[in-house]
């Protein structure tokens, strides 16, 4: 990984009614990282989201939770990235991932959107650049594509939520490893983790 990550984004829908839904898993990572570093996220209207700044291994990391709806996330990401001159390949987007089970998380660079509206808008607003990193947080799949919308906007049962929370905690630890020691070390640790 030649470039350090300069912006971590947690995809989410705004408002208390969505806070604990599976679709907001990406935001949980940003919230947990901010909590550990005692950073209060502030509402920044010009960036259409909640933002903060923290130092990991003396590297500056900006964090963002868009307060647009999910399908407009790219507007917030592009606004902040353009303002601070952050390149797509210096951005990590944390998002819920249907193709991984709850309790599993993976890092990835580049690729498509896999039907995820937040990723779709991010790619579009970054000028069709797909080279940003992703932190894919497994939420499992409801089994049929017609059930996906209700599933991602639903809340996980308690046991499943425990797995999601454990994966968020491990992801935060691995993000710090990534900032200090690079992607390979962080991947090696995160990709062997599975909360039961």
UniProtKB/Swiss-Prot annotation:
TRNA binds at residues 18, 69, 71, 117. Gene3D superfamilies: Peptidyl-tRNA hydrolase. The record marks 96 as: Stabilizes the basic form of H active site to accept a proton. Its main location: cytoplasm. It is found in: Cytoplasm. GO terms for cellular component: cytoplasm. Pfam families: Pept_tRNA_hydro (PF01195). The record marks 13 as: Discriminates between blocked and unblocked aminoacyl-tRNA. CDD domains: PTH. Keywords: Cytoplasm, Hydrolase, RNA-binding, tRNA-binding. Transmembrane segments: none annotated. Belongs to the PTH family. It catalyses: an N-acyl-L-alpha-aminoacyl-tRNA + H2O = an N-acyl-L-amino acid + a tRNA + H(+). Hydrolyzes ribosome-free peptidyl-tRNAs (with 1 or more amino acids incorporated), which drop off the ribosome during protein synthesis, or as a result of ribosome stalling. It comes from the Bacteria. GO terms for biological process: protein quality control for misfolded or incompletely synthesized proteins; rescue of stalled ribosome. Its EC number is 3.1.1.29. It comes from Vibrio cholerae serotype O1 (strain ATCC 39315 / El Tor Inaba N16961). Monomer. The active site is at residue 23. This is Peptidyl-tRNA hydrolase. One of its GO terms (molecular function) is tRNA binding. The lineage of its organism: Bacteria, Pseudomonadati, Pseudomonadota, Gammaproteobacteria, Vibrionales.
